[in-house]
Amino acid sequence: METMDTSVDLPGRWIDIEKIIKRTGPFASPSFEPDTKASPNIMNGLQNDFKVLVIGAGGLGCEILKNLALSGFRNIDVIDMDTIDISNLNRQFLFRRKDVGKSKAEVAAAFINSRITGCNVTPHKCRIQDKDEDYYRQFKIVIAGLDSIEARRWINGLLVNLVVVNDSGDIEPDTIIPLVDGGTEGFKGQARVILPKISSCFECSLDAFPPQVSYAICTIANTPRVPEHCIQWALLFGLQDATLEKPFDPKQFDNDNPDHMNWLFECAKKRAEKFNINGVTYKLTQGVAKNIIPAIASTNAIIAAACCNEVFKFCTDSSGYLNNYMMYNGLNGVYTFTFEYEIKEGCAVCGTNLVTFEIDKSNTLSTFLEKITTDSRFQFKKPSLRSNGRNLYMQGLLHQSTVPNLEKTLSELNVQEDDEITITDPALPGNLAVRMRIKYTS
């Protein structure tokens, strides 16, 4: 494909955009000042100043990239760690058969850059966690098209952390980076505008998402009973076990990599044989290791359009932006509903209060761990616990030294009424932690 001349725009390229930014309207923000021929500030902002980050270059991400580029945005970064699979081609329209096996971010960026005059999409084939805070500070707005709750929680927490509150308790407006979050599942979808520290954050509504099926860690480690326990053991402990030979770096485990998944399957199968458990299959291993979400091209198009409209409105002030959640259901016709998610008191990310958690004093730490990992408010994945300056249970290198604590009661571990337990988890970014106050029911 030939690259178009990016030195000038084609005549009439932005005629539809100009109809919005060159005249005011009933829904325009009070601060909106229409562009003039002598002072095209909004168009200059779109094309030169407003840098947008797109997270995800899959079904939703392809639509988002196309929409942003055709809306006048020229400085776009896209992050996606995945490679293109042949099953993506029916809906992820920026990819072709020759692209199978290549980076989604790199191919999508190259396609947009070659097709749309003047657009500069910079790809990054990596995890969002691989970028530091300074990288994210450069963007005017972030738009996420992710199918992972964990990743959405992480970027939400990071953007909340980037907000600076001065000594007077006031938020520094320049440190607010809005997050436009889109998600689809089959014929359903949602678009949401999150203003960190101002509106409710993603974590405030975490209990609206069904928690993933989880199992008690002590059961996985000591008394597995079903095939899923063996697969979870391979994920949680097999990858960390230095005595097990692996053809890859455990820190770089990728559930989309066939070689990595084959290793996981064989590891789980050996674990199952040890405990005389039948039923570990490659397909089941895939199902446990990753959640496969059905995708419909038309749903992606609708939600991407809604998300990009919000980005455009926010950057141009041409209309008030969404406050703050829109849901779509196309299962039996076309249905949309908009409402405001309220800030949740005691939110682990944007709240300031301790989270109160009630539990029986005789419960073991293992039971406590199981309760907080299955609680829809938190949906922890691999939590580590500290209280009174000591480690109660830790992941990683300190796992072996703290495992014995799992069978002890909270009182035996000297956790008293109203004591604070600090919980860190991979789902939370950086040094963010949940502070939990313990209340005993008996």
Swiss-Prot record:
Other facts noted in the record for this chain: Arg-192 acts as a selectivity gate, preventing misactivation of ubiquitin by this nedd8-specific E1 complex. Nae1 and uba3 correspond to the N-terminal and the C-terminal part of yeast uba3. In yeast the two subunits form a single polypeptide chain.
InterPro entries per the UniProt record, alphabetical: E2-binding, ThiF/MoeB/HesA, ThiF_NAD_FAD-bd, Ub_act_enz_dom_a_sf, Uba3_N, Ubiquitin-activating_enz
Classification via CDD domains: Uba3_RUB
Task of the protein: Regulatory subunit of the dimeric uba3-nae1 E1 enzyme. E1 activates nedd8 by first adenylating its C-terminal glycine residue with ATP, thereafter linking this residue to the side chain of the catalytic cysteine, yielding a nedd8-uba3 thioester and free AMP. E1 finally transfers nedd8 to the catalytic cysteine of ube2m.
A Pfam family annotated for this UniProt entry: E2_bind
Keywords, ordered alphabetically: ATP-binding, Ligase, Nucleotide-binding, Ubl conjugation pathway
Top-level taxonomy: Eukaryota, Amoebozoa, Evosea, Eumycetozoa, Dictyostelia
GO cellular component: cytoplasm; nucleus
Subunit structure: Heterodimer of uba3 and nae1. The complex binds nedd8 and ube2m.
Protein name as annotated: NEDD8-activating enzyme E1 catalytic subunit
Site (Determines specificity for NEDD8): R192
Pathways involved: Protein modification; protein neddylation
Homology family: Belongs to the ubiquitin-activating E1 family. UBA3 subfamily.
GO biological process: protein neddylation
Key word Ribonucleoprotein present: no
One term of GO molecular function: NEDD8 activating enzyme activity
Residues annotated to bind ATP: 80-104, 128-151
Name of the coding gene: uba3
Catalytic site: C218 (glycyl thioester intermediate)
Enzymatic class: ligase
SMART domains, per database record: E2_bind
Matching PANTHER family: NEDD8-ACTIVATING ENZYME E1 CATALYTIC SUBUNIT, UBIQUITIN-ACTIVATING ENZYME E1
